[in-house]
């Protein structure tokens, strides 16, 4: 399962580009998988908490504490960085996407 391909439609290209930079800089920290919810902290100028909850049909419920998400209710670079991290966890066998 390619998480990135499945959910990229939720993010504007410019947001994906910026999130990819955050991911490759190693700013995704403190990742916690609890049942069907995955949370992390993403370090930039400030640290923000990003999270995704997957429903049984794999529909995601997203949240982030950054101003962009809070003010515009729009998916942000922190969330895309988290999706890239989740994709890596699945690819490396650290997470069974079908089980969440």
Residue positions per predicted region:
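Long, low-complexity, compositionally biased intrinsically disordered regions
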Residues: 1-100
């Amino acid at each position: 399962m390619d998480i990135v391909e499945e959910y990229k439609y939720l993010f504007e290209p410019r947001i994906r580009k910026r999130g990819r930079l955050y991911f490759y800089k190693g700013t995704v920290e403190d990742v916690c998988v609890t049942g069907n919810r995955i949370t992390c902290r993403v370090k930039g100028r400030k640290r923000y908490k990003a999270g995704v909850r997957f429903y049984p049909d794999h529909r995601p419920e997203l949240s982030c504490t950054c101003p962009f998400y809070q003010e515009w209710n729009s998916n942000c670079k922190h969330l895309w960085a988290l999706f890239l991290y989740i994709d890596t966890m699945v690819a490396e066998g650290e997470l069974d996407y079908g089980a969440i």
